[in-house]
Amino acid sequence: MPPQKYHCNVCAQDITRSIHIRCVECVDFDLCIPCFTSGASLGTHHPSHPYRIIETNSYPIFDENWGADEELLLIDACETLGLGNWADIADYVGNARTKEECRDHYLKTYIESDCYPLASVELPGPVDRIAFAARKRARIEAFQPPPIIPQKPLASTPQCHEIQGYMPGRLEFDQEYMNEAELPIKDMNFDDDLHESAKHEMQLKLTMLNIYNSRLTRRAVRKQTIFNHNLLDYRRLQANEKRMSKEERNLLNKTKAFARLLTGPDYQKFVNSYHEQITLKKQISDLQEWRQMGLTTLEQGHKYERDKTQKFLLSKASASYDKQLRHVKSFNQTTSAPFQVRDIQKIVPRKPATPTMFSASADRQLLSEDEQALCSKLQIFPKPFLALKFALISASLTSKKPFQKTDAVNLFKHLDANKVEQVYDFFHNARWIGAPT
């Protein structure tokens, strides 16, 4: 319920919060200052009537930050709207007052007063009216929301017509939803014939129009969804999806059906919350697995995950190597000359890996920091390095004598001996292969 407003009876200007004139003889007759000084009259009112000057009473009396007019509005609102309804009371008082401010001021000034049930009228000192007005103005300006900057309208460019099929000036698409909805009614007309047979025909036509209106409603809903979620900016959406991981893209595709039910910000909040829920479930599952394995710290858990991933990749590389070996053996049985791996290298030379290519490799996180530094130095990709690691460790474990550096070089004759020696030294220093010390 808004507070009572006062308007000039001559020009109808709002004079609620400004100084105005009230006629003593006429009932509820108020004048603004310009109409009063010009001697305006209306009805039974005459400029010679006695008058009173009505001020806004914005000077503080109980609190240095609350004016007398706000005190009157607060008491009036509490009496009219009821104590405890502080949200409506704050709207009634206005002047950018919040419900917390109204509640705290009422309790402090009237309930906790030393003169209860009266309010204490003793101010700590004189109040500067100019400073009080400046604080009030700053509070009102800070309460007002910032102006909404209108978005730049889409230009009717060839991109809109050829790629998106959208015409911004008409807010239409080349192919609308249910594009043939207008065909059943395009030749419909209404006659003035009111015979009994014409009434049934009229009812049929009205039913067809209702069906057409329902289709227009569904079309408008889908179009509004496109505008609310800014789906016309497909390049930005594609760029955002490319930066997502595979799991995030799958999650986004699953939740796109809910976009029609939510606004743009609410839908984005829903997607983020859903993704956070899945992430937390995955973390809980990992923690439960770590606890079952006897791990008690996060560092042990991360090391366990790295080792598990490396074990999986090594087993996968071993299976692939066995498959290729069987293929080579079957190929040698059908040819006169044996086929070896170095023959492939002669036919299709490999381009050496660069540090930039290695840093962009998808399997780089499967290696430790020392292994990454070694691969970057020797220009070896992670997957070949893991296969080489598996082969060297397996050969060292199955060797009946201490596995020496020459054994590693002889095992990989088709590879660069210098690289094999450096990899052997790295594994030997890590105590993974070689003679025990």
From Swiss-Prot:
Pfam families: Myb_DNA-binding, SWIRM, TADA2A-like_3rd, ZZ_ADA2. CDD domains: SANT (cd00167), ZZ_ADA2 (cd02335). Signal peptide: none annotated. Zn(2+) 2 binds at C23, C26, H45, H49. A zinc finger (ZZ-type) spans 3-59. GO terms for cellular component: nucleus; SAGA complex; SAGA-type complex. Residues 347-437 form the SWIRM domain. The keyword Zinc-finger applies. Component of the transcription coactivator SAGA complex. SAGA acts as a general cofactor required for essentially all RNA polymerase II transcription. At the promoters, SAGA is required for transcription pre-initiation complex (PIC) recruitment. It influences RNA polymerase II transcriptional activity through different activities such as TBP interaction (via core/TAF module) and promoter selectivity, interaction with transcription activators (via Tra1/SPT module), and chromatin modification through histone acetylation (via HAT module) and deubiquitination (via DUB module). This is SAGA complex subunit Ada2. The gene is ada2.
